[in-house]
């Protein structure tokens, strides 16, 4: 068992690519096989080393180590396609020598005209074979005109290419709908379908698991395997990932790259857990899986044919589950970049800053599903003025206009002014003393204090909120509570 993940380094590492890598990786680990990382960088105009580094870093962050390939090495390298061009030339020359491929001098304009003519007649566009039997005189004429040939594979007529897909079952294609297709471009670079076949064969790949969009490439690749007399690997084409509107996932659906989710403060184990469930249905009702549990549970026969829907709410639900296991210190580090982003954390932190920010993060632990969400809850600590929560102004004013509210707030303000130190335990004792002094309990004490200090009816632990606001800010807000009742 040998599988590969072979991304093109042409942009941010897409979440769909991460899922393809994961299914390959899980199968390799389940079957005690080999997982290869290969880089398909023949798109010279768009491929960058920066993108390649992002792919590698993302895989490592997700915990998907590879056994062979880029940086790791192996017996079947090089593992970048641009470093394998000499190998490709040898195979190309073999096909030319055996008459299984030929040079094509047709210009893009000529090909477009043929394609349009076929479409006008209601035919499926394919190459018309114009250059299949060119004589040497015509070739010389084309070369003199400055034409540079592509290389096309001869595809047999009236042949059926069929295979048993590991996900979709029996699939077949007719060769007459394929036509002789280009395998090497005019610049000498092999096209995707040709390079991938050579790489998979030379690297001993036995199982190819990839996105459904590659299904239409399979008959062309099978034609190349046949022309070279090579064994065809087993194919499995996994379902597309759609947004909640059932359209192909794109930027309009939110973050689409692994790096974006990392920067937003999602946990790698949560993202892996979520990606595994995008198109794979485990036995039973369990939805949370450790890496080892995923390896043990994974099987190709439980991959779905139908598109998988990327549900951000489900990802948040899963990430929230994993965040519960973080220590306060780990949660602080997860949220810190986002607290710096809103100016609540200085670039250089002293111990007092760290203690305050750690308490802040732990206070809102049950209110956030990912690190960046902390930004939605910290506004009440950033200014002197309290604003009543939008849409709830009337009920909030009603709390402050309760007959007992001024008594409670006055007692709390006086007690707070006497304190030398504010901690959650000290605040708890202070509120308890206010209850005793006013002979009031429960919401008649907690609610006016919370509304006066935060402008909200509900929220996290009030003792922590008071501690985080600090004495001076609390006194200022209590002294100006009258503005909220108008």
Q: Model-predicted segments: where are they?
A:
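Small-residue-rich helix-loop
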Residues: 328, 332-438
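N-terminal Rossmann-like or analogous alpha/beta NTP/dinucleotide-binding catalytic cores
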Residues: 1-120, 217-230
């Amino acid at each position: 068992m040998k599988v590969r993940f072979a991304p093109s380094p042409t942009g941010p590492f897409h979440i769909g690519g991460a899922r393809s890598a994961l299914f390959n990786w899980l199968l390799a680990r389940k079957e005690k096989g080999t997982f290869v990382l290969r880089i398909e960088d023949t798109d010279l105009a768009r491929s960058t080393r920066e993108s390649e580094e992002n792919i590698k870093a993302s895989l490592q962050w997700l915990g998907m180590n590879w056994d062979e390939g880029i940086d790791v090495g192996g017996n079947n390298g090089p593992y970048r396609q641009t470093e394998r061009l000499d190998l490709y030339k040898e195979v190309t020359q073999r096909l030319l020598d055996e008459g299984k491929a030929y040079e094509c001098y047709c210009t893009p304009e000529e090909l477009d005209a043929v394609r349009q003519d076929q479409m006008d007649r209601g035919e499926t566009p394919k190459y018309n074979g114009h250059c299949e039997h060119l004589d040497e005189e015509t070739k010389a004429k084309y070369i003199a005109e400055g034409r540079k040939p592509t290389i096309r594979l001869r595809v047999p007529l009236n042949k059926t290419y069929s295979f048993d897909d590991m996900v979709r079952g029996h699939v077949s294609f007719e060769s007459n709908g394929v036509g002789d297709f280009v395998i090497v471009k005019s610049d000498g670079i092999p096209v995707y379908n040709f390079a991938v076949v050579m790489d998979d064969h030379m690297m001993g790949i036995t199982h190819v698991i990839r996105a459904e969009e590659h299904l239409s490439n399979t008959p062309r690749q099978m034609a190349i395997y046949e022309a070279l007399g090579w064994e065809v690997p087993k194919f499995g084409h996994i379902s597309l990932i759609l947004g909640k509107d059932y359209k192909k996932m794109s930027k309009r659906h939110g973050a689409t790259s692994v790096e974006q989710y990392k920067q937003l403060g999602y946990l790698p184990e949560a993202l892996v857990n979520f990606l595994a469930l995008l198109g794979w249905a485990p036995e039973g009702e369990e939805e949370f899986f450790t890496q080892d549990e995923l390896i043990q549970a994974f099987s190709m026969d439980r991959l779905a044919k139908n598109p998988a829907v990327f549900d951000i709410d489900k990802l948040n639900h899963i990430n929230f589950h994993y965040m519960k296991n973080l220590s306060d210190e780990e949660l602080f580090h997860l949220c810190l970049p986002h607290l710096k982003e809103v100016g609540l954390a200085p670039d250089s932190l002293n111990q007092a800053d760290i203690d305050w920010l750690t308490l802040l993060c732990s206070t809102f632990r049950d209110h956030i599903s990912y690190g960046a969400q902390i930004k939605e809850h910290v506004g009440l600590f950033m200014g002197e003025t309290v604003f009543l929560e939008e849409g709830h102004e009337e009920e909030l004013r009603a709390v402050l206009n309760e007959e007992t509210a001024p008594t409670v707030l006055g007692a709390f303000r006086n007690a707070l002014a006497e304190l030398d130190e504010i901690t959650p335990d000290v605040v708890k004792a202070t509120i308890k003393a206010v209850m005793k002094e006013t002979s009031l309990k429960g919401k008649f004490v907690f609610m006016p204090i919370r509304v006066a200090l935060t402008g909200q009816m509900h929220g996290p632990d009030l003792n922590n909120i008071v501690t985080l606001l600090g004495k001076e800010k609390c006194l200022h807000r209590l002294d100006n509570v009258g503005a909220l009742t108008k």
